[in-house]
Amino acid sequence: TIIAVKYYGKSTCRVIGGEPFQVDDAYRSLRNGAIESNSSTNTIADGLKTNLGEVNFPIIRDGIEMIVRVTEDEIVKAMRLVWERMKIIIEPSSAVAVAVLTKKKKLFHEKKIGVILSGGNIDVDDLLFRLHQNSIPAPRSKK
């Protein structure tokens, strides 16, 4: 995304990232100016469990304005929002971007926004367990 914005985007285009609190190595790396690693991979957003590397850290450091951290509950609620309103099944890692939007509404108010939503790479059993565990009602099916 950062490279595409830099190459194709306007100079006024801002890139804002999102990460789960449990795997916030990019957030901490930007704050500390050096690559940090995660001590845990306990997140529903399994596509974001990997650690930041030496190749992508400079790209992120130089191309991103900020990273917003979100909770597991915010990720699950974002997935549900997209499922119910758009009828699209998105994976938890993609829901992080939606969670950032809903968490920081004022930051994006009256702005043109692009969000990349991706696939249904989702462990349904794990998601249903988390929905029950966190007392978040499961999405309603329409009959």
Task: Provide a role label for each language-model segment.
Residues 1-143:
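PLP-dependent amino-acid enzyme catalytic core
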